[in-house]
């Protein structure tokens, strides 16, 4: 590598994928899914909102390694009010995510809203349609 090429690249760390705020970071697709709720939290903060995230899904999902990547990124997720709790199955995970988005139903909520992320496999999506249908009909809190 030429001298000027290394200067252009700069110092690179494996933590960049979660630690960098305003520059390019290289990551896998799974790592991008892990970073997504952190970015949403940053966007909400810039709008003056105090939000959190709740992530759940079925560990047997074909999104291999997402649960492990979320656990590994916990120090960064904690800084952005992101909670990961795997579900026993897709139905329970989807129900938990929807429930986390109902902050407007209770007085004294700690957050302006909780946005959610759910994942599952094909047959689990079919089974979870009841929850998804009710969540779409009932909705979420304003910032959920």
Which residues are covered by each model-predicted region?
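Thiamine diphosphate
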Residues: 1-144
